[in-house]
């Protein structure tokens, strides 16, 4: 598994993942900001390159996997087809830091508070260290789904960067979410 470490703070409802990649920092950065490259491990769509800009991601998790994958669990059925996610860029400092709000409500969608995602890249010898923090999650259940999701997406990123087969997103997500559920206190 490419994740070096994963930590959660249930009181703050936040997650932090650390991964390392044998790739130039500029190449890892491109996989964060280029819609075509990002669509291969997370979601297509646009992320404006400046603070205050729009994030308009288009998830299509069914297209991330090879033929070995299976349908998502029933509670995630709506997430298998095209699914938009909107946010605002909080910081864009190429090639080191990208931060944005996650799941901002559209007009008329109520007043839920968005969560925040921060991705930081740094050189560590001949490797790149990626630290992803997702903060201000709404609940433990939400944290479990996000933990399984980010862990699986980061595994896909590592496979893309290293030229390995991507593997089954939903199979991995389902296994990881169950593992986080066992490990995180209730």
Q: What is each PLM-predicted segment?
A:
Residues 37-38, 60-65, 91-98, 106:
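Short, charged/polar surface micro-motifs in flexible loops or helix N-caps
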Residues 79-86, 114:
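Short coil-to-beta-strand transition motifs
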Residues 35-82, 169-175:
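Short beta-edge strand/loop motif at the mouth of beta-sheet-based domains
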Residues 25-26, 48-51, 90-96, 120-129:
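A short, structured loop/turn motif at beta-sheet edges
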Residues 12-18, 54, 84, 97, ...:
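Intrinsic-disorder/low-complexity, polar/charged segments enriched in Ser/Thr/Lys/Arg/Asp/Glu/Gln
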Residues 1-51:
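Hydrophobic ligand-binding cavity/cleft-lining segments
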Residues 135-186:
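A conserved amphipathic terminal alpha-helix motif
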Residues 91, 101-157:
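Beta-strand/loop substructures that line and gate deep hydrophobic ligand-binding cavities in soluble
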């Amino acid at each position: 598994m490419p994740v070096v470490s994963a930590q959660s703070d249930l009181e703050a409802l936040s997650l932090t993942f650390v991964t390392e990649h044998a790739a130039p920092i500029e190449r890892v950065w491109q996989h964060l900001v280029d819609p075509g490259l990002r669509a291969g491990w997370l979601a297509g769509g646009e992320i404006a390159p400046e603070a205050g800009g729009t994030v308009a991601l288009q998830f299509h998790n069914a297209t991330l996997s090879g033929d070995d994958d299976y349908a998502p669990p029933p509670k995630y059925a709506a997430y298998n087809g095209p699914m938009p996610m909107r946010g605002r860029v909080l910081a864009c400092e190429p090639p080191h830091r990208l931060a944005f709000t996650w799941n901002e409500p559209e007009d008329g969608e109520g007043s839920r508070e968005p969560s925040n995602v921060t991705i930081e890249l740094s050189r560590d010898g001949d490797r790149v260290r990626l630290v992803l923090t997702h903060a201000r999650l709404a609940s433990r259940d939400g944290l479990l789904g996000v933990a399984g999701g980010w862990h699986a997406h980061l595994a896909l990123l590592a496979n893309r960067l290293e030229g390995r087969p991507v593997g089954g997103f939903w199979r991995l997500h389902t296994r990881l979410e169950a593992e986080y559920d066992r490990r995180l206190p209730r």
